[in-house]
Amino acid sequence: MLSKKYFLLVILVIIGIFFIIIPSGPVCSGEAQCITGKVTKIVDGDTIKVDGTSIRFALTSTPEMYEEKGVLAKEHVEKICPVGSTVLVDEDDMQTEGSYGRMIGLIKCNGVILNESVLESGHGEISTRYCKTSEFANSEWAKRFGC
């Protein structure tokens, strides 16, 4: 009888450890979409496609592709997060759809927040006009660049 109780206790401990160690899914802030997917295209320095869905980097603006600096911004993103990489996209709760039907969000790839990386590298600028309408405006990186 005593060994049966210990057996059950051990099983419960193992189950508890399993739920602590195994993550329950992607971790995002807010209530909007939180998706994990594969990068299918790097459009430019502030837009990628994830499983075919266009994602615009929240609070980040890079030059257009017809400008040399736009090409450099795209190359920067490609180095960190090449096509085929798995990304986590945290959709901006306060901007659930941007221009051209793109989702707007914070993108994490290979341990890097792409929004922040583009700004840190000097390939982009903070979009200050959205600082009052973005969930991410109070992030450390957004504040550092002018939100």
Where are these regions (language model features)?
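Small beta-barrel nucleic-acid-binding modules, primarily SNase/OB-fold domains
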Residues: 2-147
